[in-house]
């Protein structure tokens, strides 16, 4: 309800972003398929995703670190591989551009979730797992706020190890409803003032005195 952190130039950067040029640079041989980014932990459903991509024109962009290691481990036992490539490390703006350029984003943790929400593209969130499975309730609450269609809710549950069924297919009808959901969530966030603006207003309206911290 308090909004999310948003840079003052975020929307301008999005509007000026050359999506076609980015896609040509990072997936120059992409057929008329989906460009998918992968930033995850080690989901048990990863082999499912990779198998689903085999034989399709879709291309998977894998971020470095744990995602790349997980993909390489899964591919070691697969006789046929999907189209994929590894991305180098990048800074925040580069990560944002990847989210804007891709047709579907797999993101992990809270920071990348916020960036995925601002991107307005379909995404599947890998929430940080907790030993007592408290993250399950948090994920369900988020999916309720997102007003996710059944197929997208199932995708999140399977990706986060809450259900064992297969991942929903990346068919056009599924991606279409997921895109509508992501855009609706973005519209709701844009209708709010950014978090910093709301915090400043709260401080001013309640006459809260803020004392600058002293260096130690």
Q: Would you name each region that the model predicts?
A:
Residues 36-39, 59-64, 104-107:
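Short, hydrophobic beta-strand segments that form beta-sheet elements in well-ordered domains
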Residues 55-88:
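Catalytic donor nucleotide-activated moiety binding site of glycosyltransferases and closely related
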Residues 1-43:
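A nucleotide-sugar donor-handling region in carbohydrate enzymes
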Residues 42-44, 67-68, 131:
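Short, solvent-exposed loop/turn segments at secondary-structure junctions
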Residues 122-163:
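Nucleotide-sugar donor-binding patch of glycosyltransferase catalytic domains
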Residues 148-216:
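C-terminal amphipathic helix plus adjacent low-complexity
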């Amino acid at each position: 309800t308090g909004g999310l952190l948003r840079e003052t130039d975020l929307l301008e950067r999005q509007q000026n972003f050359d999506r076609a040029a980015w896609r040509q640079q990072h997936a120059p041989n992409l057929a008329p398929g989906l460009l998918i980014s992968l930033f995850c932990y080690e989901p048990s459903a990863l082999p499912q995703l990779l198998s689903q991509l085999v034989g399709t024109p879709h291309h998977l962009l894998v971020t470095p670190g744990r995602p790349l290691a997980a993909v390489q481990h899964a591919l070691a036992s697969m006789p046929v591989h999907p189209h994929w490539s590894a991305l180098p490390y990048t800074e925040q703006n580069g990560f944002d551009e990847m989210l804007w350029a891709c047709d579907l984003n797999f993101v992990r943790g809270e920071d990348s979730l916020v960036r995925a929400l601002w991107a307005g593209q379909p995404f599947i969130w890998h929430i940080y797992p907790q030993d007592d499975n408290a993250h399950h309730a948090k994920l369900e609450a988020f999916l309720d706020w997102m007003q996710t269609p059944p197929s997208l809710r199932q995708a999140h549950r399977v990706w986060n190890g809450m259900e064992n069924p297969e991942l929903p297919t990346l068919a056009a009808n599924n991606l279409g409803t997921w895109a509508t959901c992501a855009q609706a969530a973005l519209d709701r966030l844009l209708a709010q003032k950014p978090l910093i603006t709301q915090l400043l207003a709260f401080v001013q309206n309640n006459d809260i005195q803020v004392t600058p911290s002293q260096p130690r």
